Amino acid sequence: MRLGNRPEDIRTCVHLRWHIHGLLRQENASVVISKCLRHGAWRLLLWLLLLATWDVGSGQLHYSVPEEAKHGTFVGRIAQDLGLELAELVPRLFRVVSKDRGDLLEVNLQNGILFVNSRIDREELCGQNAECSIHLEVIVDRPLQVFHVEVEVRDINDNPPIFSVAEQKILVAESRLLDSRFPLEGASDADVGENSMLTYKLSSNEFFILDIVNKRGKGKFPVLVLRKLIDREENPQLKLLLTATDGGKPEFTGSVSLLIQVLDVNDNAPVFDRSVYEVKMYENQENKTLVIWLNATDSDEGINKEVEYSFSSLASSIIRQKFLINEKTGEIKINGAIDFEESNNYEIHVDATDKGYPPMVAHCTVLVEILDENDNAPEIVLTSLSLPVKEDAPLGSVIALISVSDKDSGVNGQVTCSLTNHVPFKLVSTFKNYYSLVLDSALDRETTADYKVVVTARDGGSPSLWATASVSVEVADVNDNAPAFAHPEYTVFVKENNPPGVHIFTVLAVDADAQENALVSYSLVERRVGERLLSSYVSVHAESGKVFALQPLDHEELELLQFQVSARDAGVPALGSNVTLQVFVQDENDNPPTLLGHQSGGPAGEFSQLVSRSVGAGHVVSKVRAVDADSGYNAWLSYELHPTVGARSPFRVGLYTGEISMTRALDESDLPRQRLLVLVKDHGEPMLIATATVLVSLVENGQVPKASSQGLPNSSRREASLMDVNVYLIIAICAVSSLLVLTLLLYTALRCSAVPMQAGCGLGKPTLVCSSAVGTWSYSQQRQQRVCSGEGPPKTDLMAFSPSLTPCPVAEVGMESHSVGGDVPGKPRQPNPDWRYSASLRAGMHSSVHLEEAGILRAGPGGPDQQWPTVSSATPEPEAGEVSPPVGAGVNSNSWTFKYGPGNPKQSGPGELPDKFIIPGSPAIISIRQEPANNQIDKSDFITFGKKEETKKKKKKKKGNKTQEKKEKGNSTTDNSDQ
């Protein structure tokens, strides 16, 4: 076959034209030309050569690349085809510009090759167009040249055939004729050419075949052709599968499900289950009673299946009067009275007709047999009702009388009576068809307030008939339940200083009875609280049970108010119960710190102190003492200097001890008189502050009064007596297990030696010193115990606590003073009547024993022995071990507390009593000092217990005989142990 002017020959040579420039540069260009010559296409070849020459002159190139080519796929040597050298691509600014997407193709400037840069999707780029090309413009400068490049994108088979829906529904009537055609929706393929040429295939079946219809310009479409009639009653629907395959390599397929719905025609008549139905029924049935429910079925569907029922034309008028038929459901019901004596059988003819066209009819016969029955039920009559019934009624009490009757005769007239189960009653037969309803078990209204008693009378007929009568038995209440509280006692917390009449709690008692028996009233169980009646503190509302505080409560006066509230009902006799209320009065910080005494003669909280200029750092100058009537953290006191004192001041105050000590040695620049303001703060909210003013006068060495040296021998004896204090401490710790036996022995010895010692010991002044770091204690009852030593004067400065004893006179308490020549008067004072125990001290006091009775101090030849750990009082700072938080601040007040402090500069010498000891169960440190009664300088670091203590009177100086007595006794004045 020769190559001529046919369209396919022209397409072949046009394709050669696109690549003519590449072919001329390759070795097989001559082969192509010779091929064209052999086929005699001289004119076409000449035209192609001219066209190629024109393309080279105009700078247009043609390439082709398949779609979906990978990145880097070779397209053509564009630089070589344009006649450009590789070395001049960069200098001449070689660049490629695309009118379409510019990132699909790219040129490597190193080798001048055009390659695929990103994925090319022909369907996305050109859609269903037969030709798809990418147009590029190649621009170079020096001189400026523009080349046009056309890259054809060849289609590949990368898209399967797709149907628009997953399932196609086709409606086919079962009466359709053979060869009926049903067009289907074809598939589409996004590819072009052979890749989009589709062929269809239908799944095998006996009813349909597939035919392909060629529509001009629209492709091929599948059509279903009916080859066999379909019976809807056998095959209501068919499911087929239509598959489309494209012509690409490899080929792709797509499928769609065909759902064929077969439409019904009226070709079936209704059918009854049976042609004759037999029914038996009793007489006297209620109107509209169902006789029979007929059912006729039709194999068709839709309106052809709907059936209507009716009496046949053969039915008599009596049948139409006595019975009704529902034309939709086929129910035959009674329309009047059916009496066995009137007729014992009926014959009913019924038709069933469908709604199809033409309508079809079915027939049946219903034979109804009437049976005689027991058609009279028993009758019940209730008389002589005795209601309501008290819940304490005795067993056997008659509640009601019952009579029964039945109009029937024989076995149908024999009646028996019964009650419902689980009721506390029973029936007692008194005569034929007469019964009594009596109480069978005890009643409890709180469990069940009323009973519904159902009396059932049943005859002996078959079937048996019965009648029922209800009796509502109400149980009358008896006051047999006392009011009950949910809990036996309640705990209430009330802050002190509450407003009068404030509601603090509500009690609630519930009475299980009813009406007035359940009406509860509340009242206080009166008693005395101290010197006052309980009703002066609280009251309770009689109806609501609300408890009110009638006056402001004071924690310092009353920490716990325990009382009972009584609840009584209004029954006869009245019943009641009590509940206990424990009202804890919570402390508030309503008491500021109170400074203890002053000795300077100035206003309260102000005193003077003489200090030698030669004292060094750490020397204790004085001590500020204060108490707080509150408890817990509200009574935990701390001391600090007022900021106005200045950083240059040589003084400082212990944070928790109140000791004023030197921070450095004094120099000439220090003023001779300095005024120190000490702030005493508690830890409450809000914080309350007291201010103490200390007037310090700096004097020379000779002007400071010095203690007499006569006390040195006595001091040596004390040092010798207590040389082994640490040994005693270790022994005391190790011998805890034998402490009880030792206590009993010491107690007996002390009691036996108490009487002789009274004659040989002078009356001294007891001084109990507290160096507590945590605030104050409340006042506790105390008694004076005197312990005598065989070597020295009687020691009367030991004191034991005993809550069971009456309070003894307490020595005056004041601020420390270093004035010379002052004697403390021996006149005792009665304690402040406001003093009382605090919660923290009571916890400690109950866990302590009297020092004498518990054997804590033991008198011996060398003086009393110490049986507890000791701490020196000379340590000026809190870190020396004196700081102890208050009870309630995280410290167990019922445990022994051993306190040690680093760097204690003062140690007890032999024969001395330790400066301080710790009472078990107490957070404070007790100091015991052995001093003569005529000591010139009062060192009474006395702990006061109480709400507020008046500032003590100034101590008067004593002269004359007392001074002479001091010399005779050989007692010397000692320095203040706090300094």
From Swiss-Prot:
GO MF term set: calcium ion binding
Residue ranges of the region described as Disordered: 859-979
Glycosylation sites: 287, 295, 578
Record field: transmembrane: 727-747
GO CC term (a single one): membrane
Alphabetical list of Gene3D superfamilies matching this protein: Cadherins
Pfam families with a match to the protein in the record: Cadherin, Cadherin_2, Cadherin_tail
Main location: membrane
PXXP repeat start-end pairs: 763-766, 828-831, 861-864, 902-905, 920-923
InterPro entries: Cadherin-like_dom, Cadherin-like_sf, Cadherin_CBD, Cadherin_CS, Cadherin_N, Protocadherin/Cadherin-CA
Regions of this protein lying in the Extracellular compartment: 60-726
Alphabetical UniProt keywords: Calcium, Cell adhesion, Cell membrane, Glycoprotein, Membrane, Repeat, Signal, Transmembrane, Transmembrane helix
Region 5 X 4 AA repeats of P-X-X-P, annotated ranges: 763-923
GO BP, sorted A to Z: aorta development; aortic valve development; apoptotic process; cardiac left ventricle formation; cell migration; cell population proliferation; embryonic placenta development; gene expression
Signal peptide: 1-59
Location(s) in or outside the cell: Cell membrane
Cytoplasmic side: 748-979
SUPFAM superfamilies, per database record: Cadherin-like
Comp. bias regions, Basic and acidic residues: 938-952
Keyword Magnesium: no
Residue span(s) of domain Cadherin: 64-163, 164-272, 273-380, 381-485, 486-595, 611-707
Membrane topology, from the record: Single-pass type I membrane protein
Presence of the UniProt keyword RNA-binding in the record: no
Function: Potential calcium-dependent cell-adhesion protein. May be involved in the establishment and maintenance of specific neuronal connections in the brain.
Other known facts: The protocadherins alpha are expressed from a single gene cluster similarly to immunoglobulin and T-cell receptors. The N-terminal region containing the 6 extracellular cadherin domains, unique to each protocadherin alpha, is encoded by one of the large exons found in tandem array within the gene cluster. The C-terminal region, identical to all protocadherins alpha, is encoded by 3 shared exons.
Protein name: Protocadherin alpha-9
Gene that specifies this protein: Pcdha9
